[in-house]
């Protein structure tokens, strides 16, 4: 039997932004191309990227508003042109950008007469408003308007529950999608035997992300989704009696650093804060949210403990391991005692560097 040769492209894939514009503060547009692709690949990538752009990217929204002494959502407030419902709809349209983890609070407290806009919202430092001119309400009389707000970072679309009213606060339908729309098209070229394709990808965003940032984040999310399949063999994943239960490997550096938790080093480890590890914001926030503040706290956790934390994945364990450079320490020519001392000394050196920076006027540690 004669096997047909499978033709594999040896050309390097390249992508380029061919058009970029800002139509308004809340509407950005970008057009990108990826080539050369073999027949069928453009559609595969285009469909996956569009779904990731529209459904996998996180955004920040106002999800709840609290008014004082308002009986129901369709009430009117004396001296305010809009009803409570209209104010809630205006708050829903506010576009925010943040590196927030979870939820936080904000507020509006103004005195009329005058127009209340997005710039009147008092926000935490981690959140910023894209368009300060967005309208919220019109105060026709010299009255005070105070609204408590809840801000959340999430993804997708959350519809408010009709029964989710808590002591004068009202839920708001939240659209966490920074990407307003995404389209892909395909251009084929070449002869019948060596047909190749160019993928065109169009992205519209609400201004909280640029199209290029959205493309980058969607790509990273897709990579994260496929990583378990890539590392299935090296991770030695196996199924137990319940075919849906997956047993993960042991926490790699938990055993190797057992000696670092000896009494003589415990004080040193408690003096090394995770702020000094230069962790990615998502991993750092996840550890902080679980009250892990020092290297000692981290090393006293098993992998099972870490995997129970919200948004924590097996790849994050690997990333922590890389940052700590444990593998490098355990494969060099030093003995175990020297490794321990070198490991701890390196962190105190970083700490000292950070203190010097503070003396020079910088706020953050290295």
Swiss-Prot record:
Location of region: Alpha N-terminal domain (alpha-NTD): 1-233
Domain of life: Eukaryota
Keyword RNA-binding: no
Keyword line: Chloroplast, DNA-directed RNA polymerase, Nucleotidyltransferase, Plastid, Transcription, Transferase
Gene Ontology cellular-component terms listed: chloroplast; DNA-directed RNA polymerase complex; mitochondrion
Similarity comment: family membership: Belongs to the RNA polymerase alpha chain family.
Oligomer and partners: In plastids the minimal PEP RNA polymerase catalytic core is composed of four subunits: alpha, beta, beta', and beta''. When a (nuclear-encoded) sigma factor is associated with the core the holoenzyme is formed, which can initiate transcription.
Protein name, entry field: DNA-directed RNA polymerase subunit alpha
Organism listed in the record: Oenothera elata subsp. hookeri (Hooker's evening primrose)
Organismal lineage: Eukaryota, Viridiplantae, Streptophyta, Embryophyta, Tracheophyta
